Swiss-Prot record:
<comment type="similarity">
    <text>Belongs to the class-I pyridoxal-phosphate-dependent aminotransferase family.</text>
</comment>
<keyword id="KW-0456">Lyase</keyword>
<dbReference type="InterPro" id="IPR015422">
    <property type="entry name" value="PyrdxlP-dep_Trfase_small"/>
</dbReference>
<dbReference type="GO" id="GO:0008483">
    <property type="term" value="F:transaminase activity"/>
</dbReference>
<dbReference type="GO" id="GO:0009835">
    <property type="term" value="P:fruit ripening"/>
</dbReference>
<protein>
    <recommendedName>
        <fullName>1-aminocyclopropane-1-carboxylate synthase</fullName>
        <ecNumber>4.4.1.14</ecNumber>
    </recommendedName>
</protein>
<dbReference type="InterPro" id="IPR015424">
    <property type="entry name" value="PyrdxlP-dep_Trfase"/>
</dbReference>
<comment type="function">
    <text>Catalyzes the formation of 1-aminocyclopropane-1-carboxylate, a direct precursor of ethylene in higher plants.</text>
</comment>
<dbReference type="GO" id="GO:0009693">
    <property type="term" value="P:ethylene biosynthetic process"/>
</dbReference>
<dbReference type="InterPro" id="IPR050478">
    <property type="entry name" value="Ethylene_sulfur-biosynth"/>
</dbReference>
<comment type="subunit">
    <text>Homodimer.</text>
</comment>
<dbReference type="InterPro" id="IPR004839">
    <property type="entry name" value="Aminotransferase_I/II_large"/>
</dbReference>
<dbReference type="Pfam" id="PF00155">
    <property type="entry name" value="Aminotran_1_2"/>
</dbReference>
<feature type="region of interest" description="Disordered">
    <location>
        <begin position="497"/>
        <end position="517"/>
    </location>
</feature>
<dbReference type="GO" id="GO:0030170">
    <property type="term" value="F:pyridoxal phosphate binding"/>
</dbReference>
<keyword id="KW-0663">Pyridoxal phosphate</keyword>
<keyword id="KW-0266">Ethylene biosynthesis</keyword>
């Protein structure tokens, strides 16, 4: 019946409705499902799954709450603000409230240490992640492609590919140079795409990086700008984590670099931004497109009418971000709290022999568990991941979901919980590692424990030096005990074998940006 139903659905429904491009049926969602079934609570479910797969910033809610209590007029749901109800409830210009766009532009400048001035008239608002999708609708047609350095945020496959029909082509970044983008890898990916008759429309980067928690330096940004200018393709910089940089080197926006490169065609440069990470407000669904291209701004603004930020949200955010004293205090305090949380988490991991890529930004660490794999394969990584979910009872994200070329890396979020919960998670990790060292209680021997020597490279980065230490460890051949059945990758969101597939590829081109303004 299931097979027949699938055929019937494909006959009467669209390709989007019948493909699995959203990706929620992929095995990488199993960790989220485990958490949803059995969420940790300090008193009601202390043995539940701790959510460390969610990049959410909960460290400064008290500052926002305090501001709201002092400024009740910023909400129409209070006695002080209710007189604004009618003005906010009626239809608004889909360009956005002028005070909202001005406040966001000003905040974006402060988030970049006021080295850049942003023009409110170039800001297009959109509901959350639809901003990135809207931008790609403006820049590319179904079947076109964007190059993207891997590892990269896996939901880009959903946010950028699913409905637009645009392909993402990853090019590999390696731990040998701390996952830095190289011109050689970029050029190779570009040439390979051309050989396959794929039209490359641009490059997408996240700065600071998700999942690495690192920032792009000025030389790399200059290289990217020079590259896209020479090829006449676009550069999209997702700067959603701009104010989460808590240690040196400082964040450098592409908007700052382009000022010193007058020969670069600014029509090719676009910035994505949001308040979800910097302000910890993903539920408010505030997504921002900032483009230097007039046609993109006008087209994206028309398209944004399908997914506007609510007027009530705009009203409150405008008041919040217009308070210079609050913004100044918030940015300083947020960076300090992120620094202390990151420092505590990574130092405790180091005590039990777990290293992380030396990051200085974002809400997570890129944790190195390669030494726990007896074989450097995706299959072994996923088996370890399932043990972490089902036995350690922590949901983390495996590197293969980010298209990382080196099995054994995991993204672990540390800012979406209180200190006590973080310490519970650390105790669980500590116990797991200690048990494994003492009696291998989380593993089952598959052969007589013949000694095997494996060379593991652990890379540690500082702001000025990179030290590579080769550590030899003897391990028996072991098989991780599983609670879930192993499944094959399915077509869709995060399979490394389906990156170039698109439900829209047969569709005719839809040149939205060519429409008369």
């Amino acid at each position: 019946m299931g097979s027949y139903k699938g055929v019937y659905d494909r006959e009467i429904l669209s390709k989007i409705a019948t493909n699995d491009g959203h990706g929620e049926n992929l095995e990488y969602f199993d960790g989220w499902k485990a958490y949803d079934r059995d969420p940790y609570h300090s008193t009601k479910n202390s043995n539940g799954v701790i959510q460390m797969g969610l990049a959410e910033n909960q460290l400064c809610f008290d500052l926002v709450t305090e501001w709201l209590l002092k400024n009740p007029q910023a909400s129409i749901c209070t006695n002080e603000g209710v007189n604004k109800f009618m003005d906010i409830a009626i239809f608004q210009d889909y360009h956005g409230l002028p005070e909202f766009r001005s406040a966001v532009a000003k905040f974006m400048g402060k988030a970049r240490d006021e080295k850049v001035i942003f023009n409110p008239d170039r800001i297009v608002m959109s509901g959350g992640a639809s901003a990135s999708e809207t931008l790609l609708f403006c820049l590319a047609n179904p079947g076109d492609a964007f190059l993207i350095p891997s590892p990269y945020y896996p939901a880009f496959n959903r946010d950028l590919r699913w409905r637009t029909g645009v392909n993402l082509i990853p090019f590999t970044c390696s731990s040998s140079n701390n996952f830095k983008i190289t011109k050689e890898a970029l050029q190779s990916a570009y040439e390979d795409a051309l050989k396959k008759n794929i039209k490359v429309k641009g490059i997408i980067v996240t700065n600071p990086s998700n999942p690495l928690g690192t920032v792009l330096d000025k030389d790399t940004l200059k290289m990217l700008l020079t590259f896209v200018n020479a090829k006449n393709i676009h550069l999209v910089c997702d700067e959603i984590y701009a104010t989460t940089v808590f240690n040196s080197p400082s964040f450098i926006s592409v908007a700052e670099v382009i000022k010193d490169m007058p020969h670069v065609n600014q029509d090719l440069v676009h910035i994505l931004y949001s308040l979800s990470k910097d302000m910890g407000m993903p539920g408010f669904r505030v997504g921002i497109i900032y483009s230097y291209n007039d046609r993109v701004v006008s087209t994206a603004r028309r398209m944004s009418s399908f997914g506007l930020v609510s007027s009530q949200t705009q009203f409150m955010i405008a008041a919040l971000l217009s308070d210079d004293d609050f913004v100044r205090r918030f940015l300083v305090e947020s960076r300090d709290r992120l620094f202390r949380r990151h420092q505590h988490f990574t130092s405790e991991l180091a005590k039990i022999g777990i290293g992380c890529l030396q990051g200085n930004a974002a809400l997570f660490v890129w944790m190195d568990l390669r030494h726990l794999l007896d074989e450097a394969t995706v299959e072994r990584e996923l088996k370890l991941w399932r043990v972490i979910i089902n036995e350690v009872k922590i949901n983390v994200s495996p590197g293969s979901s980010f298209l990382c070329s080196e099995p054994g890396w995991f993204r672990v979020c540390f800012a979406n919980m209180d200190n006590a919960t973080l310490d519970v998670a650390l105790n669980r990790i500590r116990s797991f590692v200690t048990r494994g060292r003492v009696d291998n209680s989380t593993m089952t021997t598959t052969s007589a424990r013949a000694a095997a020597t494996t060379t593991t490279t652990t890379t540690t980065t500082t702001t000025t030096t990179t030290t590579t230490t080769t550590i030899k460890k003897k391990r028996g051949q072991m098989e991780l005990r599983l609670s879930f059945n192993n499944r094959r990758f399915e077509d869709g969101l995060m399979s490394p074998h389906s990156i170039l597939l698109s439900p829209h590829s047969p569709m005719p081109q839809s040149p939205l940006v060519k429409a008369r303004t």
